[in-house]
Amino acid sequence: MDYDIRMVLNNAPPATDMPKILQLLDAGLGNQAYLVDLGDGRALALDPTIDLRSLDAAAAAHQLSVVFAAETHLHADFLSGATRLARRDGARVISSAEGGRRFEHLGLVDGEEVDLGGLTLRGWSTPGHTDEHMSYVLLDGVQPRAVFTGGSLIVG
């Protein structure tokens, strides 16, 4: 599925309509994870690091339970905490269908969507940083609310 990032961002809603998205920066590695409040006490974690302490603290502070953990790519640059969230909390892991992952996950292809219960996560194939890299567009109905690019767009 083809997207123009400018179209997605230019059509983004006003900030008051945005789901609550918490950014969790690992300054040592320069990686960012995100915690998305799904609005009902459940949350989506994106690119969680293996050290879950900051994610756990953010989830506890906002009274959230992580039920989905999405990975943008196979992480040679840091160890992912997604499978740990699956084992420990029963979170459903979402990632690209490509890459030969050897753990249970919901593998998405370009344009495929996952119902998060009120919000939708759409896979967006963005190879480059890694061949199987998957970005995600967070939708509320048909309206894009956020784009998570992982290692395909480094900011800073």
Segments the model singles out, each with a brief description of its role:
Residues 127-134:
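Active-site glycine- and acidic-residue-rich loops that bind
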Residues 11-64, 135-150:
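Conserved beta-strand hairpin/beta-sheet module of binuclear metal-dependent hydrolase folds
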Residues 29-30, 50-127, 139-140, 144-145:
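Active-site HxH/HxHxD metal-binding segment of metal-dependent hydrolases
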Residues 3-5, 9-10:
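Short, positively charged and aromatic/hydrophobic N-terminal segments
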Residues 76, 132, 154:
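Short active-site segment of divalent metal-dependent hydrolases/proteases
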Residues 73, 130, 151:
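Conserved functional loop/turn residues at catalytic and ligand-binding sites
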Residues 150-156:
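Active-site gating loops and adjacent loop-to-helix segments of metal-dependent hydrolytic enzymes
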